[in-house]
Design a protein with these regions (language model features):
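Long, contiguous binding/interaction regions
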Residues: 1-16, 20-133
Length: 133
């Protein structure tokens, strides 16, 4: 499992899980078959990258001293990221987007000194009006 996100749905008795795995069709089919054997599983849907909206969220704590603070803020603006906490020598940046966008932002912030970061893992939803029940 590369990432796992879980949240309550509009029905408080049901949770939705997004499980991200890497593998060929055989591996994916095996995972789907094993999950479908679980009594608690209501439905399983494979989300294809091109037909779904996939996002990840990250919080990144970065050293922000002197003139670097303004550059970090500008970099965040380019990525539509938000500064959610400001300390004397650091800021915490919140970014949401594709895996590639998050990784690019982290790479650009590295020269300033990343103190720590955490990512949610992908969550996804198919595009269009069809819903998963």
């Amino acid at each position: 499992i590369d990432s796992l996100t879980v949240c309550e749905t509009d029905d408080p008795g049901i949770s939705r899980m997004t499980i991200v795995v890497k593998g060929d069709e055989y591996i994916l089919d095996q995972i789907q078959k094993q999950l479908s054997k679980l009594q608690e599983v209501i439905s399983i849907k494979k989300c294809e990258k091109k037909s779904s909206c996939q996002r990840e969220m990250a919080l990144v704590k970065v050293k922000a001293e002197g003139a670097n603070r303004a550059i970090i803020i500008e970099t965040c603006d380019i990525f539509r990221a938000h500064i959610v906490d400001v300390g004397i020598n650091s800021v915490i940046v919140e970014a949401t987007g594709s895996e590639e966008k998050i990784e690019s932002l982290i790479r650009l912030l590295e020269p300033y000194g990343i103190l720590e970061y955490v990512k949610t893992g992908l969550t996804a939803m198919d595009r269009g009006s069809e819903v998963m029940k």
